[in-house]
Amino acid sequence: ITDKDAAKSIKRNNPFNVEKGENWQGLVKSDSNRFFATDTPLNGLRAGYINILAKLKRGKTLGETIEILSPKSDNNPTSAMITLAENMSEVDKNDKLEVSMDNFEKIKQFGLGLLKFEAPNHNYPDSLINEAVKLAIEQKTGVKSKAVVKDKSKMYPPPKTFKKTSEVEIKKGGKKFGALATPKRA
């Protein structure tokens, strides 16, 4: 993927370059006929992880999943993607990966391996990736888990409804929330 294409996927909040076709959460108008756009990075990351998990749930191996998502016919460095995802997730390319919270870290690392190619030179906060993985696993398993990101001020980018407030103002309110206070409507 070129730097120009990667920048477009980031602008679309679709860093995994998931193709149109599903009614994804947070869809907005896209500048592409092939790839959708979402309203937030979280919704785009969530969709990308759901797309990965859908292939894994069908019994595909790590290698087969990447070959489907990033085929060589699209001029993708599929072999290099498989090797990196294999190394990062510590899952062999010929192994299947069960979709469950028990495999949270492996699933997360598998996706991060793909993102190194799909969205090079762009790093999302760990808290955002964790929330996207959690939501995707919940979606595919139907099992709710404890929240990974409880503090919405750590979202990326921070919600526009948050107003920076000094520590003194926060302490006066009786609750300390760090650099961000409770949401205030603009």
Model-derived regions: residue spans:
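Cell-wall polysaccharide-cleaving catalytic domain and substrate-binding groove, primarily
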Residues: 1-186
